[in-house]
Amino acid sequence: LRITKSFKIMKSSVIIFPGSNCDRDMDVALKKFGFKNQMVWHNDAKIPKSDLIVLPGGFSYGDYLRCGSIAGKSKIIKSVIDFANSGGLVLGICNGFQILTETGLLPGILQQNKYLNFICKNVFVKIKNKENKYFKKIKKEILELHIAHNEGNYFCSMDELKSIEDNGQIAVTYCDHKGNEDEKNNPNGALKNIAGIFNKDKNILGMMPHPERMIDPFL
């Protein structure tokens, strides 16, 4: 995965929760692309001045109750919500996506995978909307990314789905290497093959695949 280094965003903050395990990978990825990254503990009240906040993957609080439910009520989340509501960029990867739905910053929920199994493999995804700061510099439409989750089955009400589709909020969908979106290329049973979504303003992005794992052979 190659990302053009023309972003003017230079300061990022990765939030660490008990059970996070992709925070260091994200730190490596952000620094590789020129970000001055800061690691922020979940119990801090405020986030340092940032252009981008990242909620990383992992198993925050051991995934007790529901994935992301306890993290969604942690001390730092108010600052994340305030930052997002002011137009700041917030990215949630895997467990971070689950946290964003738990806080209400993104619509829908992430359910247990269709076949009740943990999935760990590479998949292809199609970028559905490039009119945003996350994907506008990526030339490819189809990307190969890694997934590792037990609860990645995206679901929302039919009214929410219509709103999401009408507003161009579907960010990425599961597909094959040619871009075909169908059931056999849907690893977890997600509604409409959805792998990631935006909020209405496109400043918040949640996605189950891990782009940070594809930027360096070591990761």
Regions found by a protein language model. Give the residues of each.
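N-terminal beta1-alpha1 cap of cysteine-dependent amidohydrolase-like domains
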Residues: 1-93, 99-107, 113-119, 126, ...
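Amide-donor transfer/coupling interface in amidating biosynthetic enzymes
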Residues: 11, 81-85, 110-219
